[in-house]
Structure formats: structure tokens, C-alpha cells
Amino acid sequence: MRYTYVRQHDTTDCAAACLAMVCLHYKKEITITRLRDMMGTDLKGTNLTGMEKAAQELGFSTAAVRVDRENFLSEFTTPCIAQVITDEGLAHFVTVFKKTTIKDDGERRRHMLRQEEERKKCADEGKKFKCRDYVIIGDPAKELKKISLDEFYKNFTGVLLLMTPTSEFKAGKQKQGSMVKRFLDLLLPQKKLFFYAILSSVIMTVLGIASSMYNKILMDEILPYGLKSLLVAVILVFSIVSVTSALISMVRQWVLIYLSIKVDIPLMLGYFGHVFKLPMKFFATRKTGEITTRYSDASTIKSVFTSIALSVVMDIVMACATGVILFRMNATLFSISIFTTLLSILLVFIFKQPFKRINEETMQQSAILNSQMIESLRGIETVKCNAEEDRELEALEREYIKSLKISLRSSKISTVQSLISTLITTILGMVTSYVGIMQVLNGEMTLGGYMAFSTLSSYFTNPVSELVSLQMSIQQAQISIKRLTEIMDYESEQDETREYTEMEKIDGDIEFKDVSFRYGSRSPALSHVSFTIPYGKKVALVGSSGSGKSTITKLLLKYYEPESGTISVGGVDLDEYSNASVRRAIAYVPQNVELFSKTIYDNIRISRPEASLDEVKAAAKKADAHEFIRKLPLQYNTYLEEAGNGLSGGEKQRLALARAFLKDANLYILDESTSSLDFGTENTIFDMIYNQLADRSMLIVAHRLSTIRDCDLILVMDHGEIVERGTHEELLEKQGKYYELWSLQQGIFRDKKRGEKPAAPVSAAKVVEDEDDGESITY
């Protein structure tokens, strides 16, 4: 039986890859990227609820069950998905394709008892018990393998997701864009260069074949008859042929380099251009290393299609031309060359799967290693302040050693293939020499003819030998195409075929009406939230961390779409406006300020590229940033380091506020925008906000309640719901959640009953269980 194995692309893909295996078993082909979206995979992985939801959406009837060892041997539908714990202690999914099955309950119990007796007997005799029960699993992180039930149960948690296709399940192949077609579309505008490359290859082939006749003419025509006068002419002609061939080879190389550059620009920039158009959930559910390694995939594809593709064209032309000539020269020797070629092709097919597996492992491990390095460097301050350099280095070392081990296995496979290829070529080359020389000795062939055949035969066999040596690169390109295609097929955040209204300014009330939202398949982040931001009014969102405050800002910026409910601006559904125009109309200061490796001037005017230096200075003064900028050696022309390293948290926030003030929008969203500022600076900025921007709408997310006491409306959030609303004074009078938060910050909170102990905090484990509906987070 052939099992449908699918390897995961990235570290959090295991659930999607397992479901893809089950779908393939039932003749349905669907991409891992599509399945990730359906099951709500994020950086934490996928929970069982999300996977079950995706399976049901595809038309499967599902049942999540927990089984003990005896029940695992009972009859149930396979393939199914099992949850395991990896050796590193991470939750993981594998696909169970086949296993030992004992249908009768009584026989199953007797089987378990017999095994237990055998196990005890082996233990008493000091022997190792050999379990004959087996499981065939597809581990998306490793391979398809058959293992004993004992080995399986070392990692198995007992949780299975059983799946059976219903009448709603539809077999078939998901429509995918062709990366090959995309690449050919890039080559078509370069038809002229491509033609020159092929033409030069053909000319080189002809000249190469002509050069092979040199020895034949020398041995059969000149030496036997002592034609000294002809010798000079022949040497001169073939010297010209050799020089011409070398010059054309140089021109061909230049053409290939130029063609590579012409293809490189639209391919690489096209990839990042597409990535920039993807929705925020794409970035929120992937590590940076997983995205950047696709850039390497694009480079691999380019290399194969430009260099190798043209080499293949030349090799095919050369093999066909020389094949005809060789057959006419000596059919017997040609048959040996054909046999050599067929063995080399067979070798390619034999090593196809080993190379595929090792290439997939290499690319996945490369993404993991890149992500680990990026995270370590980004968090270098945290690493140093906790003196964790050695521990981080150990983590990097572990991943690097894994990469080296994969590389070593890859080298071993390549070496074995190369050795076999060399043996085939050498042994059959010696056979060809023996047969050819015997024919020369028997007078069936001239010495010059044999030498010409030997030279020409290399033109016939070399293309296949080249194919063998390039097999690793070609299969890398195939895997790269698959990985890159899944990204390129990912839908842009906005339908480019639809016409949207362009938002000029926000000049009306903003209304959230019964809005609910969740990230992936997690518990709801917002539940039936309704409120209005009247035009020109200041509205604040307060509440504990994770209560849904920042989620509201992300929905308003159209980073995500509500699961249900509507958001409107001036009575018009927000969905009617283009994403870009909405974001241009809003001045947003996020919690985490991102600064770029540009001048301070360029960093501030990113919100309004056409802004003059005077306008940038005015915005900086509003944000109380002008003074610290003025003290820098180059002031506004000071070039910032990556991510603004070298600036304090408060200085970064002031630059972010300057960006927002420069935009001069009608709606400002301040998400913890002054949390790193001292009280004096914070009060100065908020005085400016309440006075100079009194006519602008504002949504302020704050933990420091003293900054929002003058807001027109304060919304108190808890677990994704608005639990209180009103002005500062009204909420204090209610003595509810807001009063509690205010009292805590003012340092006057006391238990209502003297001597009563504060309530014990909910355990972290309980919180995680509540958030994930009791399901395990899996990677």
C-alpha cells in the first residue's frame, strides 16, 4: 500500500501537514498554507479545536477521543491524527496510517495479558522484550516509518482525531498558480537574450562536434599518407574553430549573466512586493526566518531556470546531434553508450526520494536556524541583562548541529550517488574501449574513427552525467517552487479586482456594532462589542492586559476583519473603503515603535513623505522631541541604527508621536503611546492633545488612568467585553471595575472587609486552559 506522506514546511505546520496527508489519502490535494488558515495556525501552533474545525469544513466527520493502549488496538478508521510529545518536550501531531488491529474485545484483552506475561518473563531473564504490535506513522517533521507500539507509546499522549469523509467531502486538486509559468512570464520579455543564449549554445555544439573530427582526419587522412601540406591547413582550421568556440562561450556567459540579472529584479522584488500586500495574520502566524528563507527559495529557482535550463537546452541539442552521428559511425559502440545513459537515468530515479527528503529537511531546518538567530539578535538586551548568553548560544548550537547533521547526511547521499555514477561511467567506458580497440585490431574500424567516436561519445553521455550531478539542485528547485508557490498563491489582504471607495478624511462618527473577533481558533478576543466614537470626541479604552483593547485598534485599521458585526465610519461600512486610504486617514501610534535605518527626518516623515523640514520640526515640538533631537550632532539628519538602537524607549515614543502629529489626521489612535515617558513629558503631551487637537477624534488605549481622566467617554474592557462605560467621574461613582483600577493606581485600594485576605490569583495553567477551551497548544 502506498502512503500519502506530506512534509511540514515550517515548525508550526505539523497539524496542517497531517491533515494534508489524510486529504491526499482520500484523493484531495490541498496546500499546507490553505490548511493553516482554515485551522487558525499561529506562532503557538494549532490546537485540536482548530484542526477539528478545518476537517469538518473540508467535509469530514470527526471525533476527538482519548484511548488507552488496549483500545488503540481496537478497530477504528485510519488514517487518523495522533498527538505526541517530541523528545524536546513539545506537543506535535503525526498521522497514523496503519496499525495492529484486534477486533474482538476478549481476544484483545487476552493479547494484552499475554504481552504482559512475556514482558515480565523477559525482565526476569534479563532479556529485551520485543513488541510485535506495530504502527505506521507519517511524522511531518521527519519521515514515514513503521515503529513498534512500545516506541509509539513513549511519545503518544493518548489523544486521537478520527476522521471519516462524508457526502460533503469533495476529492480533487486545489487550484494553484504555477511558479514555472510565473518564471516563464519573466523570461518572455527577455526573448532576445534567451534567443542569443540558445543560439550561442547551438553554435558551440556544432563547433564541438566539428572539433571531434580533428583526430579522425589526423589519424586516417594525414598520417597514413604523409600529407604534410594538408597538416598545416588542418591545424589552422581547427585552431580557428577552438578560438571561435572559446569566444562564443565567453559571449554566452555574458548573456547568461545579463539574463540572470534581468530576471532577478522582477522575481525577487516581485516576491517581496507580494509579501507586502499580504494580510497582518500572515505575519502574525509566521516567524521572520520562515518568510526570509522563501527569498532563498526564489534565488534557487532563478539559478536553476537561468543557468541549468539553458544548459539542458544545449545538452539536449548536443545529445541528439551526436547520437545520430555516433549511431551512423558504429551502432555497436553506440548501444553501449545508450546502456550507460539508461543506467545513469535509472540512478537519478533511485535517488529521487532520498534527495527530496533531505532537501525538505534542509530547508525546514534552515528556517528554524534563521529564526533562532534573528530572535537572539533582536533580544540581545534581554539576553545580556539576564546573563543568558551561554544558554542562547547553546540553543543556537543545538540548531546548528542539527543543520550540520542534515548536511552530513546530504553529503553522504551525494557521495554515494556520485560514486555509483563514476563506477558506471568508468566500467562501461572500459567496455567501450575494449570493444572499440578490438574492432580496430580486427579492421572493422579505423583508429581515427575510434578516437573520433570516443571524443563524440562524451558529448552524448555528459548531459546525463550532468543531470546526475545537478539532481540535488534540481530537486531543491522543485521543493523551492512548492514552498514559494504557496506564499505567492496566498491571497492579498484586499481583493484587487473589487472597486473600493477612497477615504479622504474621517469626518463622521465611528461605530462598532455587535463586533466579535478571535485570532485563529483561539477563544474570542472580542465578544459582541458595541460603542460609538462621536466625531471630535476623545474615547479611552482601559482594562487589564489581554482584555481586547489593542484588538479594537487593529480592526479599525483593517489589519483584521470582524468575525461578526460591523464597523462604520460616518454611516458607511468600513469594508467599503480601501485599506490604504483608511490607514492614511488615521494617525496611529502602536505599542511597539518601529524605527528604520534612516535619518530622524525620514523616520518622522514616513507618515507624510512630502513634508518639509519645518513641518517635521513642528510635529517634533508637539511630541516634545525637538529638544533631544537638537542636541544630536546632526540633529534631524542623524542616521538611526537598526530598530532605533541607541535611543531610549521614551525617545522612540516621542518620534512615533511626531509621526502621528505630522499626519494631521482627523482620527488619532494612541495605543499605550506614552508608556515609556516620564510623568512630566506625558502630561505635556496630553495637555497639547486636549487643547491643540480638541476638535479631532481620538481613541486612546491606556493603562495609566491619570492620562485619560479628561476623555469624553471611557470604556472598561474585561475578557473581550465592555463591562463599564462613562466619564471618569461617572465610573468612580459606580465603584466598579474602573474604580478598582483607579484605586489600585492611586495606592488607596483596601479590602472592604478588614482582615480579609486578597483572593488567590488564578493559576497560569488554569488561564491557559480557559483560553484554549481545554485543548493543548501544539506545534
PLM-predicted stretches and their roles:
Residues 236-245, 249, 311-361, 431-445, ...:
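Transmembrane helices of ABC transporter permease
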Residues 1-210, 224, 228-233, 252, ...:
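Membrane-integrated ABC transporters
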Residues 215-216, 256, 276-321, 378, ...:
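Juxtamembrane loop-to-helix connectors within ABC transporter transmembrane domains
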Residues 198, 202-213, 243-250, 301-304, ...:
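Hydrophobic alpha-helical transmembrane bundles that constitute the permease/transmembrane domains
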Residues 194-248, 255, 327-332, 434, ...:
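Transmembrane helix-loop-helix hairpins at lipid-water interfaces of multipass membrane proteins
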